């Protein structure tokens, strides 16, 4: 695929036209906003722990949550988890993640099949040998019976070995054989798209199918999805598999997904981070939201611009204020998204000295330019490009937060006084 030439406008390219897939109360693809999803790492059979983590992910902003369904106990737990979430007032589509035995679990636990909003199927391990087509067909029949969409998710860590061997043999007979990376890419794409077309032949509508083909290399992922997007009109789920821990996982996922999203490819995303010991699982949700927001695809919470600091900003106060303001607006968005729609598009600036402080603050809806080393101990505040007030004294942080809240009330209140 030849990359497009960017237009003069500083916006992402038009979204790729795909099938629109209804998943619970959400619609994925068909031009709808890119959806953020996540996955639990609890034992699904532990109803209390799994319900708690789904709720945490939902509160952080996950719009769909996937759970492992690997045995009879976990399948039986799904309806109980859904019931507890409903009692908590949480409406979030639950996705069942099936490998090896999904056909049997869905047949044995009809309540699980009914409650799940979508089934994730791995074409690389849905069945082996002669059983593959039979067990794949049973899964599709279940999706048709219960009116559920599916995601056919190929992964280079669990490739269909028979398909891989077949395509490698075909490649060896070429006059000009592809390199190993091209063959791998073809196996992934053929596995996903071919399985989807087989599902359609079995009677599953095209608008109940989402595809993914995940690898752990940035350039490989970009190449796979560009190729797959050119071959089909199915909605696509993006994710860099096994992205890793900490900053490496964040950077790798963002580097790959940002390119694809900019090209209009992708209808739902997950950031597959390895949590650090003791770290909340919700980080993957926050990173996904920030990726979509900083690239101009969606808005979730007011964005805070802050300078990195230099020798002019020896005080840590501006860093602490930037962190406090970011956490404040993120916490408030739980209420603001209902009472003050549009507040999520607001921009704020917390700057540390006079060099870029006033200018950057003028670009924001509301910004503060704190004094740097040797500057007067005053902090001018700019609102919608105009200097509004100068803050002094020991309550600058709280005074600025009050100004932010007042601004939100005046500009975004659903029912202004």
UniProtKB/Swiss-Prot annotation:
Catalytic activity: (2E)-4-hydroxy-3-methylbut-2-enyl diphosphate + oxidized [flavodoxin] + H2O + 2 H(+) = 2-C-methyl-D-erythritol 2,4-cyclic diphosphate + reduced [flavodoxin]
The UniProt record lists the keyword tRNA-binding: no
Keyword Iron (UniProt): yes
Enzyme class: oxidoreductase
A UniProt-annotated Pfam family: GcpE
Pathway of action: Isoprenoid biosynthesis; isopentenyl diphosphate biosynthesis via DXP pathway; isopentenyl diphosphate from 1-deoxy-D-xylulose 5-phosphate: step 5/6
Cofactor note: Binds 1 [4Fe-4S] cluster.
GO biological process, one term: isopentenyl diphosphate biosynthetic process, methylerythritol 4-phosphate pathway
Name by which UniProt lists this protein: 4-hydroxy-3-methylbut-2-en-1-yl diphosphate synthase (flavodoxin)
This protein's encoding gene: ispG
């Amino acid at each position: 695929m030849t990359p497009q030439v960017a237009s003069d406008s500083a916006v992402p390219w038009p979204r790729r036209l795909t099938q629109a897939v209804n998943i619970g109360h959400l619609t994925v693809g068909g031009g709808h906003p890119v959806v953020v999803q996540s996955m639990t790492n609890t034992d699904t059979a532990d109803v209390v722990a799994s319900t708690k983590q789904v709720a945490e992910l939902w509160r952080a902003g996950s719009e769909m949550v996937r759970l492992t369904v690997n045995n009879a106990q976990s399948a039986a737990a799904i309806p109980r988890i859904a019931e507890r979430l409903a009692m908590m007032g949480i409406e979030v589509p639950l996705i069942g993640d099936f490998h090896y035995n999904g056909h049997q679990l869905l047949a044995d636990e009809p309540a699980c099949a009914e409650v799940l909003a979508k089934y994730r199927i791995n074409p690389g391990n849905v069945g082996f040998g002669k059983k593959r087509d039979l067990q794949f067909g049973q899964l599709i029949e279940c999706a048709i019976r219960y009116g559920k969409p599916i995601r056919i998710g190929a992964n280079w860590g669990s490739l269909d070995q028979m398909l891989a061997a077949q395509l490698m043999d075909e490649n060896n007979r070429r006059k000009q054989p592809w390199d190993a990376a091209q063959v791998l890419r073809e196996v992934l794409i053929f596995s996903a798209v071919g399985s989807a077309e087989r599902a359609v032949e079995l009677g599953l509508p095209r608008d109940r199918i989402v595809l993914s083909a995940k690898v752990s290399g940035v350039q490989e992922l970009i190449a796979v999805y560009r190729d797959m997007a050119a071959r089909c009109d199915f909605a696509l789920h993006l994710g860099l598999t096994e992205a890793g821990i900490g900053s490496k996982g964040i950077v790798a996922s963002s580097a790959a997904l940002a390119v694809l999203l900019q090209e209009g490819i992708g209808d739902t995303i997950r950031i597959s981070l390895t949590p650090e010991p003791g770290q909340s699982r919700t980080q993957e949700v926050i990173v996904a939201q920030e990726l979509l927001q900083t690239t101009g695809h969606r808005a979730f919470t007011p964005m805070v611009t802050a300078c990195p600091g230099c020798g002019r900003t020896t005080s840590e106060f501006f860093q602490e204020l930037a962190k406090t303001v970011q956490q404040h607006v993120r916490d408030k968005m739980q209420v603001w998204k209902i009472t003050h729609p549009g507040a999520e598009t607001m921009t704020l600036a917390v700057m540390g000295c006079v060099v870029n402080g006033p200018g950057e603050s003028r670009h924001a809806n509301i910004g503060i330019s704190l004094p740097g080393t040797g500057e007067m101990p005053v902090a001018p505040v700019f609102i919608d490009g105009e200097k509004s007030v100068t803050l002094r004294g020991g309550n600058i942080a709280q005074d600025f937060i009050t100004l932010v809240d007042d601004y939100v009330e005046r500009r975004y209140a659903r029912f202004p006084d």
